[in-house]
């Protein structure tokens, strides 16, 4: 798939901009703080209906304006696609092929993207929350049902935590209410756990050979899912439900004392091992970067295997973070098969011929000069 057109209205520092893109590599060139990353973010938001940089949608709206709008046209193997996302202080409205989507979970997945930015190097060395967010966003692109289940889980989790806090303060003591909330939470938690495990198993299958090649045959990558309940790697949904039910029962007294839910997908983690050692704890910076790069390239292949279309790749100021060998491997891997957007302050340090042949868009103060 590839994005043929992007139109921004009142988005960040863009008042109005409309651009056409080629199927290959598109370089967004400019000094810092001119709007390069804002454009990359806009493409990401168009696809995912949320930003990777902020959780506050108001940040996306241009100063002193009431709304921001992102519009895009794309070509997929299944046909043409038009997308529109309106962001106001009241919320978001999304349209796909001019049809308003009742829920954002219906909208996400029509356009697929993989973002690789400097902060994605924290995928390995960052907090468990970073890794959970990564997994959830990627599964959501290929499974709208997962987005719905995750949203329902988060709402129920808030309700359960609120009730636990009231029980902690002795404002409520009805165990039956907690039983109902727990029972509803258990099934959703089990579904999320099962889907995460399946996704990470597939991701590992794609990432292992990529990592082996980038490390020039010196390293073997293993991705381990660490759920908050003790279940075997081959456990079916019914067994995962049992495990959650048993664990919640055992933890109830502690949860009431703490006033919060101590078990569930919101406490999962993912660990990356290279040659049997945890990369987060024992890996060098080079190993951490190789692992992050291998995972990002594996995402491309996994989405293609699931959907039959390669996603759009967004490389936001990340090439400068990679050495020449990793740069070359990344750019060779995407050649002629993945539409790619690259932001950089200069192309001089990028020697690969794929960049030299790219379409160059120059950004200055929220205005873009397209290639002639």
UniProtKB/Swiss-Prot annotation:
What does this gene product do?
Answer: The RecF protein is involved in DNA metabolism; it is required for DNA replication and normal SOS inducibility. RecF binds preferentially to single-stranded, linear DNA. It also seems to bind ATP.
Keyword DNA damage part of the UniProt annotation: yes
GO molecular function per UniProt: ATP binding; single-stranded DNA binding
- Which residues does ATP bind? 30-37
How is this protein named in the record? DNA replication and repair protein RecF
Family, per the entry? Belongs to the RecF family.
Q: Where does it live in the cell?
A: Cytoplasm
Fetch the InterPro entries from UniProt. Answer: DNA-binding_RecF, DNA-binding_RecF_CS, P-loop_NTPase, RecF/RecN/SMC_N, RecF_2
Q: Matching Pfam families, A to Z?
A: SMC_N
The family database entries (SUPFAM superfamilies) matched by this protein are listed as: P-loop containing nucleoside triphosphate hydrolases (SSF52540)
Is Transmembrane helix among the key words of this record? no
Swiss-Prot/TrEMBL GO biological process terms: DNA replication; DNA synthesis involved in DNA repair; double-strand break repair; SOS response
